[in-house]
Amino acid sequence: MRKTTALEIADIFSCSLDTAELPISFNVAPTSRVLGIVNSGGGPSVGAFSWGLIPRWAPDTSRAASLINARIETVGEKPSFRDLLAQHRCVLPMDGYFEWNEQLRHDAMKPIKQPYYFSADSQSGYSHRGVLAVAGLWTAWKDPNQPNSPVVHTVVALTTDANDMVSKVHHRMPVLLDPSGVSLWLDQNNVDPLAHIQVVDNEALVVCAVSTKVNNSRNNGSELIEPIMLTQPQPVEELKLF
């Protein structure tokens, strides 16, 4: 979820702006356009990417919707990701993100997918003026069957085991970066970027239950992140999204 503009992101992270403004989105779905910060040698810059990695060797775009997240524990082993660790790291700025678990509610006939909204605690070291910084990887893909087609830049977000607070909702969470972590992740001279990833403390994020309207990607408004009161929720089973 992003309500911060590209221009504001460039200011917060002290980088240049290399994209036209993208629309604000309270409900970012796979393959949507998102902002990413990269360092291609001339210093960090904010660019536009499609969320869902298309490996450079892919014959088409069919894999994009399924490659939105990658486990940091195995990212160095998977063919789709390992070659990107050296020079294709990026930071994905966001105001928050959604996670779900299944719950039985007395006002529903069957389990529902209850969404929760996670955002930065303003006092946390992981808050960049209220914005979260998530470690990611990016690549550039060109349709091998269309020589004149444009290059498509895509990204994948890295996830890790959830801390105690997040695990009450989901067993995974994004790999969050503090200011020094952002610098190290984007540093092209950093030959072992995974070694600098830190465990995120329970105070880094705040969470609230939100409306199930977010379950429909066609809904996209500020009401999607407004807290709601749940009616005696009873967790059934955690969804295995990552």
Language-model-detected regions and their locations in the chain:
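Short linear sequence motif anchored by a di-proline
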Residues: 1-242
